[in-house]
Amino acid sequence: MMPLSMVNGGEPSVIPKVGGKEEIRKFLETLGFVVGGTVTVVSENDGNLIVNVKDSRIAINQDMARHIMI
């Protein structure tokens, strides 16, 4: 397992764990980052990750990406 912030783009990955404080986990869940869900890193732009999750493209910063394990 490693944080999403360390992943190279292109390959879909299943999320086994979402860490952090409860408020951070809840926020990430509302964006679609749930255990068992699939996420694909599309690109990195100015320290932000562009990811596909639940048929949506979302930008998250490195701090949030560190809480999402794949």
Q: Which ranges hold each PLM region?
A:
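Compact, glycine-rich, soluble single-domain proteins
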Residues: 1-70
